[in-house]
């Protein structure tokens, strides 16, 4: 909550993953981590988790920042007045008030990551590791009933995405519009 030096620069750096195309980042991961313990040719799951996390970091940061902005500073000051440590104030006052924002941000991050195409297409190279988007693509290319199965998986993905966004809206209520305002 305190203003730190170069806070605007830090905020801009957190938003960089939104500005870079996912396919560029995915190719960068492949080039960087091939022949290491995170080799996407062997097992892309750790690298997919890292890629999804980095690409969705701005949503989570904005969600947490919105929750902190909506929490009154006077609550922290009152806690300090009564002798509570910063950790106790964080654990007993701030976290319960910001928790809804964190859950909603997590739901949005999960929903967007679940249907991410660029990272999945590039990083998942073996069919046993395909995320849903790459599986949809692979099924769509199959002859016969592959298109129908791909369409069904796409509908399931859209239903899960809708449920996550509705869940985030229900958790945040009228605060949903505040989620992505500039910190």
Model region roles, listed by residue range:
Residues 1-3, 42, 113-114, 144:
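Helix-loop interface residues and adjacent transmembrane-helix termini in multi-pass membrane transporters
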Residues 16, 20, 54, 61-64, ...:
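Transmembrane alpha-helices
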Residues 27, 47, 54-76, 114, ...:
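Membrane-embedded alpha-helices of multi-pass transport/permease systems
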Residues 4, 65-76, 80, 84-92, ...:
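C-terminal transmembrane helix and the adjacent membrane-cytosol boundary/short C-terminal tail
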Residues 2-10, 23-55, 87, 123-128:
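Membrane-interfacial helix termini and adjacent extracytoplasmic/periplasmic loops
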Residues 13-22, 47-58, 110-114, 125-129, ...:
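Hydrophobic transmembrane alpha-helices
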Residues 13, 50, 90-95, 104, ...:
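Hydrophobic core positions of alpha-helical segments in small-molecule transporters
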Residues 114, 120-163, 167:
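Interhelical loop and adjacent transmembrane-helix boundary motif
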């Amino acid at each position: 909550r305190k203003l730190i030096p170069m806070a605007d620069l830090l905020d801009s750096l957190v938003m960089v993953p939104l500005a870079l195309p996912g396919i560029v980042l995915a190719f960068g991961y492949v080039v960087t981590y091939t022949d290491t313990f995170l080799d996407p040719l062997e097992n892309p799951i750790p690298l997919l988790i890292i890629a999804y996390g980095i690409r969705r970091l701005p949503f989570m940061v904005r969600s947490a920042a919105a929750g902190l902005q909506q929490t009154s500073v006077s609550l922290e000051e009152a806690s300090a007045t009564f002798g509570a440590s910063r950790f106790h104030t964080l654990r007993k006052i701030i976290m319960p008030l910001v928790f809804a924002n964190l859950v909603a941000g997590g739901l949005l991050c999960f929903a967007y990551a679940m249907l991410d195409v660029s990272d999945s297409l590039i990083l998942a190279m073996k069919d046993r590791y395909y995320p849903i988007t790459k599986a949809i693509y692979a099924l769509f290319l199959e002859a016969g009933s592959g298109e129908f199965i791909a369409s069904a998986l796409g509908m399931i993905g859209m239903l899960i995405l809708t449920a996550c966004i509705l869940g985030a809206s229900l958790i945040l209520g009228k605060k949903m519009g505040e989620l992505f305002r500039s910190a």
